[in-house]
Swiss-Prot record:
The keyword Cell division does not apply. GO terms for cellular component: ribonucleoprotein complex; ribosome. This is Large ribosomal subunit protein bL9. Belongs to the bacterial ribosomal protein bL9 family. Keywords: Ribonucleoprotein, Ribosomal protein, RNA-binding, rRNA-binding. One of its GO terms (biological process) is translation. One of its GO terms (molecular function) is structural constituent of ribosome. It comes from Variovorax paradoxus (strain S110). It comes from the Bacteria. Binds to the 23S rRNA. Coiled coil: none annotated.
Protein backbone atom coordinates (compact mmCIF):
# COMPACT_ATOMS: atom_id res chain seq x y z
CA UNK A 1 0.00 0.00 0.00
CA UNK A 2 1.27 3.49 -0.85
CA UNK A 3 1.24 5.83 2.15
CA UNK A 4 2.37 9.35 3.05
CA UNK A 5 4.35 9.47 6.29
CA UNK A 6 3.24 12.20 8.70
CA UNK A 7 6.11 11.51 11.11
CA UNK A 8 9.52 9.88 11.02
CA UNK A 9 9.15 6.10 11.28
CA UNK A 10 12.18 3.95 12.05
CA UNK A 11 13.29 1.80 9.08
CA UNK A 12 10.49 3.19 6.87
CA UNK A 13 11.10 6.87 6.11
CA UNK A 14 10.80 10.47 7.19
CA UNK A 15 8.13 13.16 7.23
CA UNK A 16 6.49 13.57 3.83
CA UNK A 17 7.95 10.47 2.23
CA UNK A 18 5.64 8.45 0.02
CA UNK A 19 6.53 4.82 0.63
CA UNK A 20 5.13 1.39 -0.08
CA UNK A 21 4.56 -0.80 2.98
CA UNK A 22 2.67 -4.00 3.66
CA UNK A 23 -1.09 -3.50 3.86
CA UNK A 24 -1.38 -4.89 7.39
CA UNK A 25 1.39 -2.64 8.74
CA UNK A 26 -0.33 0.41 7.27
CA UNK A 27 -3.90 -0.50 8.27
CA UNK A 28 -3.16 -1.88 11.73
CA UNK A 29 -0.36 0.38 12.96
CA UNK A 30 0.68 3.41 10.90
CA UNK A 31 -2.73 4.82 9.96
CA UNK A 32 -4.49 4.25 13.35
CA UNK A 33 -1.60 5.84 15.28
CA UNK A 34 -1.63 8.90 13.01
CA UNK A 35 1.83 8.33 11.57
CA UNK A 36 0.62 7.91 7.99
CA UNK A 37 -2.23 8.37 5.51
CA UNK A 38 -3.09 6.59 2.28
CA UNK A 39 -1.37 8.19 -0.70
CA UNK A 40 -4.46 9.36 -2.58
CA UNK A 41 -4.50 12.55 -4.65
CA UNK A 42 -6.70 14.31 -2.07
CA UNK A 43 -4.45 13.28 0.85
CA UNK A 44 -1.33 14.36 -1.07
CA UNK A 45 -2.82 17.82 -1.68
CA UNK A 46 -3.93 18.11 1.96
CA UNK A 47 -0.48 17.06 3.18
CA UNK A 48 1.28 19.63 0.98
CA UNK A 49 -0.99 22.33 2.42
CA UNK A 50 -0.06 21.32 6.00
CA UNK A 51 3.59 20.42 5.31
CA UNK A 52 5.15 23.50 6.95
CA UNK A 53 3.02 23.11 10.06
CA UNK A 54 3.92 19.42 10.39
CA UNK A 55 7.63 20.13 9.89
CA UNK A 56 7.54 22.78 12.65
CA UNK A 57 5.79 20.32 14.99
CA UNK A 58 8.37 17.62 14.21
CA UNK A 59 11.24 20.05 14.82
CA UNK A 60 9.71 21.14 18.14
CA UNK A 61 9.29 17.51 19.21
CA UNK A 62 12.92 16.78 18.31
CA UNK A 63 14.18 19.83 20.22
CA UNK A 64 12.15 18.83 23.28
CA UNK A 65 13.53 15.29 23.12
CA UNK A 66 17.10 16.57 22.78
CA UNK A 67 16.65 18.84 25.81
CA UNK A 68 15.26 15.95 27.86
CA UNK A 69 18.09 13.73 26.59
CA UNK A 70 20.72 16.18 27.84
CA UNK A 71 19.14 16.13 31.31
CA UNK A 72 18.65 12.37 31.31
CA UNK A 73 22.11 11.44 30.00
CA UNK A 74 24.30 9.84 32.65
CA UNK A 75 21.44 9.40 35.11
CA UNK A 76 21.68 6.48 37.51
CA UNK A 77 18.54 4.58 38.49
CA UNK A 78 18.77 2.62 41.74
CA UNK A 79 16.38 -0.26 42.33
CA UNK A 80 16.14 -2.79 45.16
CA UNK A 81 14.83 -6.29 44.50
CA UNK A 82 14.77 -9.51 46.49
CA UNK A 83 17.76 -11.63 45.60
CA UNK A 84 19.40 -14.88 46.55
CA UNK A 85 22.84 -15.28 48.09
CA UNK A 86 24.44 -15.80 44.66
CA UNK A 87 23.24 -12.40 43.37
CA UNK A 88 20.41 -13.65 41.16
CA UNK A 89 17.10 -11.87 41.53
CA UNK A 90 13.82 -13.52 42.45
CA UNK A 91 12.04 -12.15 39.39
CA UNK A 92 13.58 -9.45 37.21
CA UNK A 93 13.82 -5.73 36.56
CA UNK A 94 11.82 -4.82 33.45
CA UNK A 95 11.53 -1.71 31.31
CA UNK A 96 8.32 -0.84 33.19
CA UNK A 97 10.18 -0.81 36.52
CA UNK A 98 12.88 1.47 35.11
CA UNK A 99 10.33 3.84 33.51
CA UNK A 100 8.41 4.03 36.80
CA UNK A 101 11.58 4.90 38.74
CA UNK A 102 12.53 7.54 36.16
CA UNK A 103 9.03 8.99 36.60
CA UNK A 104 9.66 9.27 40.34
CA UNK A 105 12.87 11.18 39.56
CA UNK A 106 10.89 13.66 37.45
CA UNK A 107 11.50 12.36 33.93
CA UNK A 108 8.59 11.62 31.61
CA UNK A 109 9.50 8.30 29.99
CA UNK A 110 7.15 5.58 28.72
CA UNK A 111 8.09 1.96 29.27
CA UNK A 112 8.19 1.42 25.50
CA UNK A 113 11.02 3.97 25.31
CA UNK A 114 13.27 1.96 27.67
CA UNK A 115 15.35 -0.53 25.67
CA UNK A 116 16.90 -3.50 27.47
CA UNK A 117 19.44 -4.98 25.03
CA UNK A 118 19.72 -8.36 26.79
CA UNK A 119 16.16 -8.66 28.07
CA UNK A 120 15.06 -8.08 31.67
CA UNK A 121 17.82 -7.60 34.25
CA UNK A 122 18.09 -10.72 36.42
CA UNK A 123 21.28 -10.11 38.42
CA UNK A 124 22.45 -7.67 41.07
CA UNK A 125 24.83 -4.94 39.86
CA UNK A 126 25.15 -2.20 37.25
CA UNK A 127 23.65 -2.41 33.77
CA UNK A 128 23.62 0.06 30.89
CA UNK A 129 20.18 0.68 29.41
CA UNK A 130 19.17 2.78 26.39
CA UNK A 131 16.24 5.20 26.48
CA UNK A 132 14.87 6.16 23.05
CA UNK A 133 13.24 9.56 23.55
CA UNK A 134 12.85 10.10 19.79
CA UNK A 135 13.92 8.14 16.72
CA UNK A 136 17.00 10.41 16.56
CA UNK A 137 17.63 10.77 20.32
CA UNK A 138 18.83 7.71 22.23
CA UNK A 139 20.42 8.17 25.67
CA UNK A 140 22.28 5.61 27.80
CA UNK A 141 21.60 5.46 31.53
CA UNK A 142 22.96 3.24 34.28
CA UNK A 143 20.65 0.98 36.27
CA UNK A 144 22.02 -0.24 39.59
CA UNK A 145 20.17 -3.17 41.13
CA UNK A 146 20.71 -3.87 44.82
CA UNK A 147 19.90 -7.25 46.30
CA UNK A 148 17.71 -7.57 49.36
CA UNK A 149 17.98 -10.95 51.06
CA UNK A 150 14.74 -12.36 52.35
Amino acid sequence: MQIILLDKVLNVGGLGDIVKVKDGYARNFLIPTGRARRATAANKAEFEAKRVELEKAAAAKLAESQAQGEKLGGTTVKLTQKAGVDGRLFGSVTNGDIAEELGKQGYKVAKSQVRLPNGPIKVVGDSTVSVALHTDVVVDITVTVYGETA
